Amino acid sequence: LRRRQRQMCIRDRSLLAFQSEDGRWYQVVNRGDDPANWLENSCSCLYVAALCKAIRKGLLDASYLEYARKGYEGVIRSLTWEDDDLIIGNVCIGTGVGDYDHYIHRPVSANDLHGVGAFLLMCEECEQVF
């Protein structure tokens, strides 16, 4: 049942409707219109990885590649360099249950392991379908 629910969520393009012009998704996905909300890289990486994996496994058709590529490019554009170090910024530190205000005021980090792991997973999945 869970697999079918995940497929339906992606196939009905509900998540894709909230993809920003930049290609990434907001910390609170459905509130991109609020200036206090911000584009978050770890969730964006995981959404792109999920799209690519679903395409690779035949669960989604190739028309979804444009959304995956747009998300990938949005994340890549957001990266910075400090000397020889790649910086993955805009990563929410930790999670927890809270209201909207709680989520948009979560600490933001660079190179937090949640973000680095999600970035590596995204790159691996993208490499297999791009």
Regions found by a protein language model. Name each.
Residues 39, 43, 48-130:
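CBM-like carbohydrate-recognition segments
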Residues 26-33:
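Short linear capping/connector segments at secondary-structure termini
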Residues 1-10:
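Single conserved hydrophobic/aromatic residue that forms the stacking wall/gate
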Residues 11-12, 70:
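Conserved active-site loop region of the serine DD-peptidase/beta-lactamase
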Residues 18-23:
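C-terminal ends of transmembrane alpha-helices
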Residues 14-16:
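Conserved ATP-utilizing enzyme core subdomain
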Residues 4, 33-44:
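Short, surface-exposed loop/turn motifs that are enriched in glycine and acidic residues
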